[in-house]
Amino acid sequence: MELRDGIEGTKSGTSTAGYVTALTLEFSPYKATTIFISNADDTSSLKYKVVAYALMAGTLTTDYVAEQTLAQGADTAEINITETPYAKVDIQVIDGDGNADYVIEYTQERLQR
């Protein structure tokens, strides 16, 4: 959804046995991003990481957030990325101890010119 000074959105899905990109967020023209990742599953844990790219079509990456685990039962993590030169970030998810349903919510604030 487009906001006056930025955007917001949500994405949900189910993890698998291999890492998949659940959501890609582009940073131009945004300066600040808040991401909530929630494990919406009552029986399985969820693992995630946030991978940053310097270039939109780049192949070199760095783990902005190394692999973390969210316990079953609506465990939620908050990630704040501010004033970064990243082109984009991928939020990647994988099974913890079984397929887990997840929800990702985010907001991005525009650069003020």
Predicted segments, located by residue:
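Solvent-exposed serine/threonine-rich low-complexity stretches and specific carbohydrate-binding patches
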Residues: 7-13, 62-73
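Short, surface-exposed beta-strand/strand-loop-strand elements in extracellular ectodomains
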Residues: 43-59, 105
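C-terminal interaction-tip segments
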Residues: 1-19, 24-26, 40-42, 93-113
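Tryptophan-centered short beta-strand motifs
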Residues: 3, 16-23, 53-67
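A generic structural motif
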Residues: 38, 53-55, 94
